């Protein structure tokens, strides 16, 4: 009996101790961030969630605009269109200057396909003059969002918006494209997600020389959410490419005479005039009532140099071979006619107002051949036959482009970068195979169709020790929980060496 009486305090102490430990564990778990990310391996879910989440890529303010009016605002974002319908979606915008405020309603239009959960949205409204602060408001809750003044001058009258590059290594295509564009009066605006470091350094020098403008294309992240959402990068069409192209359009809407939406491997050689501007003006002058041009993309192969020292534009053109395969094309637009765009064209601008340019076509150089004759195995996935070049590239243009390339190659800074550029493909065949398996095979080869959102975010990109990547990054912010849409955005974008070669 004495032993039993002494044991009671021990049991009580043990019970209290265990309760404290359990309480500590529960408190610790509750303080840890809870992930609201939902997964959809099939890429086909239409589940309706309590809130549609939106990632704002950019907001531009136009003190004046030919097509948007006075004190206009234009938003570009990726937004969940399945939780709430985004057809004719509107939202409240509050604009402030030092003395006044204006409440307005933004109207919107979307670009892209219905089977992707996140769709590109462009929204527009007009606000207070001399805008200083901007908010989006819903049901009494608001979030302040950053904005920029749109461009009113451009380096060239023709801006070529290059779709976002990731794990970029094909510097030969870049050198070919940038010098051709410069010869014909075009300026490349290039979006970068990730790129081999030496290639990035090469681009930076071209930017300093005035040939290109580099821009960030950021991976979408929701930094703090109280409601569930599907991972945006896995559920948007092709890295939100339509968002990048719409952003580029809105940047230069008041600055450029023409804006083209090309990939890095789409190169246009004007056929009848010495410059893009003259060629485009001529085509539209001959077609009254039209306001944009549609160029097909003809598949080509070329032999690429392995080093910058041996790169020769003359030899490259001599090696070009054409196919009979002309794929869905890309557009060149008068910016006042377009407010948003998809990858190939805008569904909000009638195809009847386009000119279908039969010749020339875009020279599409997706899969080059190495100088040693080695063919990229990915080429065998496409059953394409090549023959003699059937595009017009004038001899005087070839000489001028070659001279321009040689001038750049002789710059000391370029000479120092050249030896560190990749001499062979690594990421290209990996990415091409992944894209082929996830979409192109069943769309163009088996033709059984693809039910899921066209997306290859799940591509496994191995990291290299010999070639590191620069990746775009930023400060990420989430607004307060708002209904029906919660907004996320970034500030202070920068180039990072710490992320790697990823999408």
UniProtKB/Swiss-Prot annotation:
Membrane is among the record's keywords: yes
Keyword Ribosomal protein among UniProt keywords: no
Enzyme class: transferase
Compartment(s) of residence: Membrane
Annotated GO CC locations: membrane
Membrane disposition: Single-pass membrane protein
Entry-linked Pfam families: Glyco_transf_92 (PF01697)
Assigned keywords, A-Z: Glycosyltransferase, Membrane, Transferase, Transmembrane, Transmembrane helix
GT92 domain segment(s): 156-441
Cysteines engaged in disulfide bonds, as pairs: none
Transmembrane parts of this sequence: 7-27
EC number(s) from the headed UniProt entry: 2.4.1.-
GO molecular function: glycosyltransferase activity
InterPro entries: Glyco_transf_92, GTase_92
Homology family: Belongs to the glycosyltransferase 92 family.
UniProt-recorded name of the protein: Glycosyltransferase family 92 protein ZK381.2
